[in-house]
Amino acid sequence: MSDFYKTVKGVSQGIYREKMSRFLAFAEPVSSVEEARAVIKRYANEYHDARHCCWAYMIGTERNEYLSSDNGEPSGTAGKPILGQINSFELTNIVIVVIRYFGGIKLGTSGLIVAYREAAKLAIEAGEILECHEQARLSFTFPYLSMNDVMKVVKKSDLKVIEQAFDNVCSMTIEADADKVPALREQFAGIDGTSIIS
């Protein structure tokens, strides 16, 4: 398992033209299959007058959750070339949607493959590629009297607090780079009265 992965920073767009057909490509970061599907649906609705809305996505640091669609184009001429660009750039947590406006001239199988590949590539290159750390969460409980010690670790390590509850027995869930969680687990476990939940 890798602690790092590459994705795009935000939405980026590329436009490829071939024989009067226009290919509008959009690359967008996503964190789940559901989010990718929502993005695909949004573009399909927005560009409902287009001939085709082809797409591919890759999810997860292991890059093992992926899918692509030719959306009516000949099999293997759209979705696979889009997915191929995701693989070429070694990206994950990304969806690329390519909208085709047909220009009246057929491109043939090889022409379609080139067009969808180039459109996807242009969308990726138009954006910024980020190298991100895989994130993990750590949940624990602690007595209220240990609050200062817990907060010192949180501030010193610049941790993102996801959830917290304060009472006689307090609870907290933090998020950090996955490779730092084992050391943080030890730090929090060393604070008097602290119990690690997960």
Q: Which stretches of residues belong to each language-model region?
A:
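Short amphipathic alpha-helix segments
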Residues: 140-159
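Non-DNA-binding regulatory cores of transcription-related proteins
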Residues: 2, 161-178
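C-terminal regulatory domains involved in ligand/effector binding and gene-expression control
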Residues: 1-76, 163, 190
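Short glycine-/aliphatic-rich beta-strand segments at the starts of folded cytosolic domains
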Residues: 128-144, 172-174
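Helix N-cap motif at beta-to-alpha junctions
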Residues: 32-33, 143-147, 175-182
